[in-house]
């Protein structure tokens, strides 16, 4: 536990933090990088089985989908919003000098969407995005594979490392997903979800267990066919 022993020390801390808060992009990068470093030192798993994806893996997946300033990007199991942050960093690295004011406005908010069932993770992800210049993202408490999520053909990019922990309640699963793969396994349901949420021509990069590629059950075969 870290204690602030005197009012004088507290004043110095506040003054130091105020000096960090500037609109300069490089300083915002520093704050975001520091926040991500601190996240890496926290417990690795959330209450629902989420694990933080290592940054080099996230960056590789973002490179594969090559997001553009006009994309709509979603992570339906966002955790700490690592994939969304990596996407933002990719866009700044490749398009910062050529983006229009309208594209910067899109970048600051509606471009990025994340869902999660862990309220603590949602608070962490919102702060993570704000520290990377994304001031108004759509971060919602939502069970992505349930009936409460009816989003269809909305996004151009999906990135995710969905939970592989067990199964979900069959009665809560969205009927559209069960029509694609009749299962309670989360890894298969999320793949069906990506197919539904993406626009025609959309791109997706997702981490899955080996069983998704080689499983012989009817559910595995049906999702691979789609």
Feature map (PLM): residue ranges:
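Short, conserved SAM-binding segment of the class I
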Residues: 189-193
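Long recognition/docking surfaces used for binding and targeting
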Residues: 1-42, 50
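Short glycine-dipeptide loop
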Residues: 198-204
């Amino acid at each position: 536990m870290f204690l602030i022993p005197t009012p004088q020390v507290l004043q110095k801390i506040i003054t130091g933090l105020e000096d960090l808060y500037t609109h300069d992009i490089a300083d915002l990068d520093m704050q975001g990088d520091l926040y991500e470093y601190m996240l890496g030192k926290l417990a690795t798993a959330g209450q629902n089985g989420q694990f933080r994806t290592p940054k080099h893996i996230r960056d590789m997946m973002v490179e594969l989908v090559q997001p553009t300033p006009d994309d709509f990007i979603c992570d339906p199991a966002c955790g700490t919003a690592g994939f969304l942050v990596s996407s933002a960093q990719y866009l700044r690295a490749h398009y910062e000098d050529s983006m229009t004011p309208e594209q910067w406005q899109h970048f600051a908010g509606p471009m990025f969407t994340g869902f999660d069932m862990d309220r603590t993770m949602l608070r962490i992800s919102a702060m993570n995005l704000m520290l990377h210049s994304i001031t108004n993202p759509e971060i919602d408490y939502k069970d992505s594979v349930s009936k409460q999520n009816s989003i269809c053909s909305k996004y151009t990019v999906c990135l995710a490392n969905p939970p592989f922990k067990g199964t979900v309640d069959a009665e809560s699963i969205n009927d559209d997903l069960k029509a694609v793969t009749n299962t309670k396994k989360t890894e298969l349901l999320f793949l069906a979800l990506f197919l539904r949420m993406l626009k025609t021509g959309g791109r997706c990069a997702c981490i899955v267990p080996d069983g998704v590629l080689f499983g012989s059950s009817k559910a595995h075969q049906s999702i691979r066919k789609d």
